[in-house]
Amino acid sequence: AYNYFHFMKILVLGSTGMLGTYLVRYLTDISSRLDNSENLELFSASRNGNDFYCDFSVTETMKSILNDINPNVVVNCVAITSLEYCERNPEECLKINGYAPGYLAEICKEKNSRLIQVSTDHFYEDDGPKAHKENDKTFFLNEYAKSKLIAESEITKRGRNFLILRTSIIGLTKEQRSYLDWILENINHSREVGLYFNAYTSLIHCKQLSRIILELAQNKHLSGLYNISNKNVFSKGDLYLAIAKRFGVEPIYKKEDLDSRLLKRSISCGLSPSKIESKSDLS
């Protein structure tokens, strides 16, 4: 599928986070399998090294990196994702998650680079297992969700050639303990856990999202806001049970309910990918 790949220079920002790690690994693999590996040039930037050092709180750093590379596509995976940290540090959260992406969109517009912004699914009222569409009403219960909504607004105002992807990811990395790590750890040690059957999601694996991001990067006709998610909406409790079943383990759990207001986070995070499916070959 990639033998007819048009030349592309891709910059991944936030390349040492969970999604960034998967994306860089995937793009490196694709590049090695191309007839002409020079057709896909990959650059990565993060606060932890990689090709370039990038501190998102210093906007001039972004500008100098884009000037050095002149990328065709910039994928922004940078975000402070800890809800607790965002609540304790709202100004830093707004700067990194909210306003920096808007500035990045402006630089991309100047450089004629395509921006792919990774957003979130934390935007909805408690409406059960609903598969939310892009035009459904949004709201926020915490600083993290507020900052990601601001990013969407800033990019839309200041950018030109961009894609905003609302999504929720699952995966494993060596660098940080993920939700999937927590599930596997508890299953392997037969620990009793509290499972929430009123918290809904449409999680997509980082591997699959990485593949989709590359396909979107090549599709120059798409722009705007899209949900990129699992086709199904399921509770986090059901996800836990499904993974346990796959490993042939009988899980020990007690059923619990989440109160979104008390917790200060949305629990109805289902997404519908019908818009992107109608406009592309993605599945």
Residues covered by each model-derived region:
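NAD(P)-cofactor binding segment of oxidoreductase domains
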Residues: 74, 88-116
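NAD(P)H-binding glycine-rich loop region in Rossmannoid oxidoreductase-like domains
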Residues: 56-96
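SDR active-site strand-loop-helix element
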Residues: 13, 45, 77-78, 115-121, ...
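Mid/C-terminal beta-alpha module of Rossmann-like enzyme folds, strongest
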Residues: 212, 216-262, 267-268
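NAD(P)-dependent short-chain dehydrogenase/reductase
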Residues: 153-201, 206-208
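Rossmann-fold cofactor-recognition segment
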Residues: 47-58
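Catalytic helix-loop patch of NAD(P)-dependent Rossmann-fold dehydrogenases
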Residues: 95, 99-103, 123-165, 169-172
